[in-house]
Curated annotation (Swiss-Prot):
Transmembrane feature ranges: 103-123, 128-148, 153-173, 182-202, 205-225, 264-284, 291-311, 346-366, 383-403, 420-440, 447-467, 481-501
STAS domain segment(s): 532-655
Top-level taxon: Eukaryota
Originating organism: Stylosanthes hamata
Keyword Membrane: yes
Keywords from the named record: Membrane, Transmembrane, Transmembrane helix, Transport
Pfam families, per the entry: STAS (PF01740), Sulfate_transp (PF00916)
Location relative to the cell: Membrane
MF annotations from Gene Ontology: secondary active sulfate transmembrane transporter activity
InterPro entries attached to this UniProt entry: S04_transporter_CS, SLC26A/SulP_dom, SLC26A/SulP_fam, STAS_dom, STAS_dom_sf
Region feature (Disordered): 1-35
GO cellular component: membrane
Protein name (Swiss-Prot/TrEMBL): High affinity sulfate transporter 2
Amino acid sequence: MSQRVSDQAMAEVIAETRTNSSSRRHGGGDDTPSLPYMHKVGAPPKQTLFQEIKHSFNETFFPDKPFGNFKDQSGSRKFVLGLQYIFPILEWGRHYDLKKFRGDFIAGLTIASLCIPQDLAYAKLANLDPWYGLYSSFVAPLVYAFMGTSRDIAIGPVAVVSLLLGTLLSNEISNTKSHDYLRLAFTATFFAGVTQMLLGVCRLGFLIDFLSHAAIVGFMAGAAITIGLQQLKGLLGIKDFTKNSDIVSVMHSVWSNVHHGWNWETILIGLSFLIFLLITKYIAKKNKKLFWVSAISPMICVIVSTFFVYITRADKRGVTIVKHIKSGVNPSSANEIFFHGKYLGAGVRVGVVAGLVALTEAMAIGRTFAAMKDYSIDGNKEMVAMGTMNIVGSLTSCYVTTGSFSRSAVNYMAGCKTAVSNIVMAIVVLLTLLVITPLFKYTPNAVLASIIIAAVVNLVNIEAMVLLWKIDKFDFVACMGAFFGVIFKSVEIGLLIAVAISFAKILLQVTRPRTAVLGKLPGTSVYRNIQQYPKAEQIPGMLIIRVDSAIYFSNSNYIKERILRWLIDEGAQRTESELPEIQHLIVEMSPVTDIDTSGIHAFEELYKTLQKREVQLMLANPGPVVIEKLHASNLAELIGEDKIFLTVADAVATYGPKTAAF
């Protein structure tokens, strides 16, 4: 790194620095600077232990002050506000009118036409009978409409969570047709809801943010490909298909059945409707006004294919069909949940994982559409709403539900105004359960497979992956790790890799924070990173280091060693350039939001090491928390009060050469 000092003042600066620096050796504040600084670093008012704990608790769990409007209210008013807090529909419902209902009614009918065929297909991903998908789109949306805060999110089963649930449950009970498998699905749904509700009630929603965007992109893409590969069984009419989900096992199963297991009529039906679905998606993507074409196309596929199989009796020639679907509303499943026994632990494990993944997807969808309409959602209320609907769902024969991106997008484009669109959709699903389900008897499984493949195509976000590569290579590695983990091993392995890489990135950033050498921008008193601003000039006889992180036990030793390494490297370069040796080391602490006892100890060791090297340590702009701890630990006294400055410019003006001050 080359020394950046203006040429015209070089000789004068060197002479002055060598003359004056000998009288300014470090000494804990014994020397009197020639140019006093104008401002001292202020210390915050002293707080009691209780005040500190209260402040930290409120900032961690109640940063949005959710109960601020309860203050100074009567008891009856507080009761009303409490009900409105739990059930937001009681608040916005007061302003509901016919115009809003018109938009919600149209949107509800539109997403119902999309959700019914998807529900039949997604239930099969979870290794459940098709009617459980319909059950899940009846109860859960009703609960969410009363408790949720998003106007646009559409609730129901989704592909990724269905696949995750089916994979994890089949690992516990291989016979997916057994009654215990169904009971375990309800148990997992119950504990998924409990997990989500606890996160909301305890206001621990920030925990789901530990799964990075990059990991989610990779996981979703891998899950989409895995889901698509699983549908080859229905699309090709294969009866003897592997139970493994990795790409190697699936492709081996496909090719081993190529001569005897494929059914040409099934392939013709499946591919025809898949092409139709993809064409309608393309039309809707190119012309947003024609979104309804893509929305109703799955229902058209189900109706046309069912009629075709019925009149041709293709089921007699090897085309597999849905067969019987139960009619009627959801039966109670409260007695089916494992609250004890050998499957309780499995239900808790699967439920926690499925609940967190479902919650992550729902929050991402809710925030996306809220930003598009310029309103905000309450994350903790969303978690409570999601948890409640899954707990209630587990008691009414539903499996894990969450926000669906495809349905929410259609809901948004159809002009929904409030969550009432979910109520309209639920009513349509109820009518379907009561009246229409027998008509699905001849629906070919190949069409359901086509609907699933068309639905998950958009989950493979190539543009997002390319953007990750351009912006952050580590994020791209996280994305690819999750992606390959899903397609080559399993969904749970991919999810584990996604979480592990997300935590690894956090640990890497915490334990190895960035540091930078600062220089003065010509003609200003501003000091910036000399790598970012090549024209920035370093001050003769001084080294200015900025630490870009809080200083904790996990990184304090690294920061100390990195500062000393900067000192050695810069000192060697200045010696080679015959420039003044470094006599003052300034640590710019503006980005340092906090410091713990390990950080204090590291600075004490740094101070002692610099004393041996006859280099004077100075600090610039420590924040309120940091300066308070510096005084409490006596580190400020050790360094010297006159060595702690409000700005780098003050430190340079006080101890640097006069020509560098201006």
